[in-house]
Amino acid sequence: MPKWLKTLLKTAGVLACLTILLWMGAVAYVHANKKEVLEKITAQLNENINGTLTIERMEPVLLRGFPGVSVALKNVVLRDSLWQVHKHDLLQASDVYLAVDVLSLLKGAPRIKDISVEGGRVYIYTDTTGYSNTTIFRRKKDTTGRPSSLKINKVKLENVSLVFENKSKFKLFEMDIAQLVARLDYNNNGWDAKVTTNTLVRNLMFNTEKGSFVEKKRVNANLNLSYYEETQLLEIPLQTIKLDKDKVKLGGKFMMGSKPASFVLNIEAADISFKSALSMLTPKISEKLSIVDISEPLDVEASIKGKMKFRDTPLVVVKWRVVNNTLTTPAGPVTDCSFRGIFHNEVRGGKGHNDRNSGITVYDFKGSWERLPFKVDTLLVTNLTSPVLEGRFTSQFELAKLNRIIGGKSFVFNKGNANLNLHYRGGISQADTNKAYVYGAINVNKADMSYLPRDLTFTNSSATVRFKGRDVYVQNVKLQGGSTVLHMDGSLLNFLSLYYTDPRKMVLDWNIRSEEVDLINFIGFLGRRKQVAARQEEKPGNSVSRMSAQLDKVMDASTVHLNLKVGKVNYYSFAAQNLHADVSMRENIIVLNEVSVNHAGGKLAVNGDIAQGGSVNKFAVKAKVDGVDVQEFFRSFQNFGQDAIEDKNLRGSVFATADVKGSLTEKGKMVPNTLYGFVTFDLKNGMLKDFEPIQKIGKFIFRNRDLRNVSINKLANRLDIAGDKIIIPPMYIESSALNLHVDGVYALNKGTNINIDVPLRNPKKDELILDDGERMERGMKGIVVRLKAVDGDDGNVKIKLASKEDKQQRLKKGAAAESADEAP
């Protein structure tokens, strides 16, 4: 072995022995002078406090702190002078270990280097007057001029609870420190510290009325801190810590020298879950933001700035960035979304840091909702007490994508495109009380669609739906159904108020124009709305299902008001011109307020209603006929469901009024034997052509007269209709071939019983008599043949001579009528 190495080893051994001897001497000194050492340590600790420090006993610890000497202080209690008032010990610890410098101990002036507290609580308390138990640390007046000898190099806490409670400023911080080790390095400016900690943050309330940040979060960190004594600034550079399982960067400043003291905390987290990010905020803020969720991790930055003063709520700014994520909202999930966002609890400067003045701003938002792509340049959510959302939404999509949203129960789109540009301001969820306002338009082009409840199909259609506040206007509508092209515009006032709350009050006003309409293309409106099963490839979300169900409810309950102007109208064999109609449709009722049309050289006017019952639809109408060609009129309406007299038998112009009730099939055909009511008519320039009942009279009389073409000079009466019966009051008919007096009942099935009185007098003899009463009286003079029309065995009406009993009954009936007329 080299000589120099032997010398080195001997020297090291001697130094080690001296160190051990010195350490043993120090330990022996402590054992021998416990009371004196305890007094000196207590005195050193008391240098910077104004209060009471109580130590039950002191014991030396042999190996702890080697090569220094450590002592254990048992049951240490530190109290301020007003402890009897507030009852909060500043420090209460079962074990406090102090590492003492050996040389200072041997000199009789022990200097504390390290402090370790195990199993205790630190409670920093400030009452409502502003008094704090930390006043115990106010330095006593220095009479020696010497600086304090207490400079701790290391502080260690194990299983210590730390509470900071400020009653006057409504602040409460609570932490359970499993372990904290702080190594301090003193310099001319103050000190630097390296802190390692494992701590559970139970509460971090900057305002106890607002709730806690990072509540019940475990913090694992290796932190570097710097304290500048002159400015009383504690600086925490931005560095990584762990909050539960999330890695975040934490930095900040605590400015204790300012009045009041202030602080800034900065937090950054990359790839953190949205729920984890929310959990770092106060429950109130978290609850407001939890109306949405983000499936994949995102990048978050948060800044908290506040003052340690009465009821101060710190300024909170949270920024985040989302890329290709899924955003869940009250209206359903938004997929493939990317955006930048910021939360700010002071939207308007000087209005305070509170929910009402808080807001969320989202930039460059893009995503897909129910497969509809859309963009929002800037989206605002303000007043988190009662949230208001505002933003301009733009989208271009194929109309077929709407089928999934509306459920395929009302409308089904087969082709076409839509361009959406809407500015929305209002509540976020249906329960919100804020009124919603929408401005902008939706343009629809080249649309093919079906309206299933009415079995209607439209092709190559277009429209512009314009939103103005709470109202909706539908403009430039072109609907092509079959051979019919409709041009429409409409309005739906107060749409946003009534859509969910009271759809029965909704009225959709339509103005409809068309050159020609074939009503067969719209026959589906006659029947009741059909219940259609939803056609969905996939089941949509609950919010979309509710929207679809509500759309069907609105379509069922709302009122549609139509104002129509049509150049030409066709309906089976009916043809008319210049249709003007005012029609209302509500639930299962079609109300014809005022309908007029030119038809067969005259004019028709109708009002009434149709009750949609499905296969059979009941109607009640009042109609007026002015100067209509009677043959065309009967032909157009399929002889009104009867065969007593048909269009082929009639000529002339008719003036009539009708008040009838009946039933139509869902195809618009008259249901036989369902017509009830009355018709008053006046036939001018009339003719009966090949009318079989008249021709049958010729078998009895007037065989030489032309009964195939009978011109009617005057024909006016009222007919009462009762199902399959037409009741004919007494009616005098003047014609070119004969005069007739008719009354009775004509039955469409069985029960025909018509009295026919035929005077043999030639009508031409009375042509020069202008007075109608005189002409009728003279026409019935002379021989009168009394006939009767009854049911034949073959089902047809037959004409026969009246029996003696029939004649007597008719004479009595006539006498009674004359007596009634002569009565005063």
Question: Where in the sequence are the language-model features?
Answer:
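Short loop/turn motifs that connect adjacent beta-strands in outer-membrane beta-barrel proteins
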Residues: L105-A109, F310-P314, G350-N354, Q430-K435, ...
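N-terminal cofactor/phosphate-binding cores enriched in small/glycine residues
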Residues: L45, L98-A99
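Phosphate/ribose-recognition catalytic cores of enzymes acting on nucleotide-derived substrates
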Residues: A93
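N-terminal type II signal-anchor transmembrane helix
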Residues: M1-T52, A823
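Short extracytoplasmic
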Residues: N46-S70
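Intrinsically disordered, low-complexity segments enriched in small/polar residues
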Residues: T135-T143, F525-K553, P824
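Small-residue helix/turn framework positions
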Residues: G68-L90, K113-T129, I152-F164, K171-R183, ...
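Conserved ATP-binding TGD loop and adjacent catalytic N/P-domain core of P-type ATPases
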Residues: Y572
